[in-house]
């Protein structure tokens, strides 16, 4: 009977929280019933040397990518999680864009939210400011660590060692920001991660200084929507993404007629994603275009073997558009 009474009380409490509550600057913020249950672990960070900033997250929740991570070039990056107030993402970016610091944003967003004790929020601004909030009613184990240029945060974890392990992994990792943030997520999973398990993950990286070409300012945007091993799949996707960065660089070199540079880029791409016929095909085209026809033949053969007859037909069409010049 006592358990039934407790359950009824909890249900009544949740139902009374279902209406919208006043939020920052007079906006409406969702009540608890409207909040996705994205209990999770995440990292927000900025690399001031490379000029990158972003968010990475894993959760036992379907398609966490549209919910938790938010970032805008030249503005900042935000993770909103636990019983998620999704409005923290766009509202927080708007506040940053208006000149507020990361600390100001966290204070303003949580101050106007009646459900703040259930929220977890982390913000990094384009100047390297970092601020985090972990509500007192986030499901244990829950906590965060704010370090130089980053914050790691987690809730509903199996162990309280998750976020310290994330911080350590990020601090010792080397390489691009996306790979360093992924290392932090992997360290969290090694500590047991979410007590419920794992399902989805995402990485979002943008430029810390916006350029006059906004289409080039989102550097990484990868999501694993539903997987038994989302971080394994996310790492695979990140490697494929890096391969295609080199493919894109190769394509640009071809446009400029710089086939030697194209050759280097396509070769690197193939080494990163050797099972995709796209990589050896354009590698072979570049070899042929710099006069290394004999070297191109086995690479063409590999592409044709992987991709089938359509790739042979594609090769036949390239001379007429001057992309195969031999």
What do these predicted ranges mean?
Residues 23-245, 256:
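N-terminal nucleophile
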Residues 269, 302-303:
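Canonical positions in the second alpha-helix
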């Amino acid at each position: 009977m006592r358990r039934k009474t407790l359950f009824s009380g909890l249900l009544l409490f949740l139902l009374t929280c279902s209406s919208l509550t006043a939020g920052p600057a007079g906006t409406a913020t969702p009540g608890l019933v409207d909040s996705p249950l994205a209990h999770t672990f995440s990292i927000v960070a900025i690399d001031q040397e490379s000029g990158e900033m972003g968010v990475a997250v894993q959760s036992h929740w379907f398609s966490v990518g549209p919910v938790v991570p938010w970032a805008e070039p030249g503005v900042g990056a935000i993770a909103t999680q636990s019983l998620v107030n999704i409005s923290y993402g766009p509202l927080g970016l708007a506040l940053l864009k208006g000149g507020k610091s990361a600390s100001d944003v966290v204070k303003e967003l949580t101050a106007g939210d009646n459900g703040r004790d259930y929220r977890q929020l982390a913000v990094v601004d384009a100047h390297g400011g970092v601020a985090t909030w972990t509500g007192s009613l986030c499901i244990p184990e829950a906590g965060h660590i704010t370090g130089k240029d980053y914050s790691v945060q987690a809730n509903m974890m199996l162990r309280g060692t998750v976020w310290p392990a994330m911080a350590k992994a990020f601090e010792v990792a080397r390489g691009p920001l996306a790979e360093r943030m992924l290392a932090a997520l992997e360290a969290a999973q090694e500590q047991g991660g979410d007590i419920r398990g794992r399902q989805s993950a995402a990485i979002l990286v943008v430029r810390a200084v916006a350029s006059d070409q906004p289409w080039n300012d989102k550097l990484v945007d990868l999501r694993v929507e539903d997987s038994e091993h989302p971080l394994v799949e996310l790492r695979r996707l990140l490697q494929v993404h890096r391969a295609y960065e080199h493919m894109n660089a190769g394509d640009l070199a071809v446009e400029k007629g710089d086939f030697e540079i194209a050759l280097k880029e396509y070769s690197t791409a193939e080494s990163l994603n050797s099972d995709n016929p796209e990589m050896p095909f354009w590698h072979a085209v570049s070899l042929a275009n710099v006069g290394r026809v004999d070297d191109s033949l086995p690479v063409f053969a590999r592409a044709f073997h992987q991709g089938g007859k359509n790739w042979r037909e594609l090769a036949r069409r390239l001379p007429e558009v001057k992309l195969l010049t031999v």
